Amino acid sequence: MRMFLLLLPLVLLLSAVETQGISVVDLSALREIKNSLTDITSSSLNAFFTSWDFTAPDPCSSFAGITCSLFIPKRVTTLTLGTGLSDSPGLAGILSPAISNLSELTQLVLFTGIVTGPIPDQIGTLKKLSVISLTNNRLTGSIPTSIFTLPNLHTLDLSHNQLTGTIPGSISELSSLKVVVLGSNKISGEIPILPTELLHLDLSNNELSGMLPRKNRMPLTLRYLSVSGNRLWGPLSVLESLSELVYLDLSMNRFSGTIPSSLFRSTLSSMYLQRNNLTGRVPQPPLTSPAATVYGPGSTVDLSHNSLTGELTNTLAGVETLFLNNNRFTGAVPKDYVESVYSGNTRTLYLQHNYIAEFPVKEGLPLPDSVALCLTYNCMVPPVPLGFMACPVSAGGQISRPVNQCSAFNTSMA
C-alpha cells in the first residue's frame, strides 16, 4: 500500500502525458507564457488565446500558434504568439523566461502588439532555434548575447522595437546566420564584423555610428544591405567587393567621397544613396560588365541631395525610377535619358535643383501619362508644361535658377 502511494504521483503524471499527448514540461511552459501575456482585444473573434484551453485533450492540435513533434510525449517545435491578422491589435505583457523550457523549439515568432520588457536571456539555451522573429512591439533592453551562441540560428528579426545597446561582437561567430533585421530600434555603437555568409542585413533607423566594416570584413554573400537613417560616415569603397548585392540603402547618413563604379550595374536594381555627402561624377560602369547599363522594369536609383557634379553619363539611362535632384549636375541631359522618358521605360525622372542647361524635347511628341518629369530650378527654362507639371512640393515654386547663380557656378567649375 505504501509503495502504491509512493508511485501514485508518477502514475498520475504518466496518465496526464498519455491523455494530453504533450510533454508536461512544455504544457507548464505554455501555461506560464499565457499568464505573462494577454490579448489586447476584448473580442473573442480576434483574440489569440481563446483556443488555449488547458483542459483540452490535446493542446498540440487545439492551441493556436503551436506545432508539435509527432511522438509522445509531444514536444512544441514552433511557437507563434499572436494572430498576425491586420484587424488584430496583438498581445500585451512580457515574454516569459519559461519559453526556454521548450527545449525542442525551432521557431519563435511574436506578431505585432505592445509586448514590453526585455528579451529573456534564457532564449540562448534553445539550441535548436533557427528562427527568432519578435517584431513590431515595445521590447526594451539590449540584445542578449546568448542569442549568438545558437548554432542553428538562420533568421533573427527584432525590428521595430525599443532595443538599446550595441550589436554584440559575437555575431561574427555565428556562421549559420543568414538574415539579420534589427531596423527601427535605438541600437548604437559601430557595426561589428559580420558572419561570413550573411545574405540579408537591415540595420536601418537606429543610432549607429562609425564606418562600415573594412572591405575584407564585409560578407561577400550579401544580397540586401540597408543601414539608412543612422550616423555612419566614411567612403563607399568598402562595397566594391559586394558583387551579389541586389538592394542597397545607405540613405540619410554622412557617407562621403565618390561612388564606386562597381555599384552601377543592372543586378543592383535598387540603390538608395540620397542625403549623404557624396561628391564627384557618376562614373561609367566597369568595362568588365557589358550589360551593366541595362536597367529593367522595377529598377530604382536615388542619388538625390548630395554634391555630385559633372555632366550626366549614360550610366543610368533606362532606370525606371530615377532621382538625381538636388546635386550639381551640369550640361545637357543625354539623349538616352530623353528616349527612355518618352518611351515610358523611365517613369520618374527628377532633375530639379541642379545646373542643367538643356533637356532636348521631342517636338510634337507628348510624354506618356505614366511619366513624372521634373526639371525646375536649373540653368534653363523647362519645356512647358513637361518640366514642372509633375514636380513635388519640395521642388519649390521657382521655374529656373537665377542667372547669376549659373554664371558663378560655371566660373567656379571652369
Please report, for each region that a protein language model flagged, where it lies by residue:
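Surface-exposed cap/linker segments adjacent to membranes
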Residues: 2-65
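The feature encodes a structural signal of leucine-rich repeats
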Residues: 92-100, 119-121, 140-145, 164-169, ...
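C-terminal capping segment of individual leucine-rich repeats
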Residues: 101, 125, 135, 149, ...
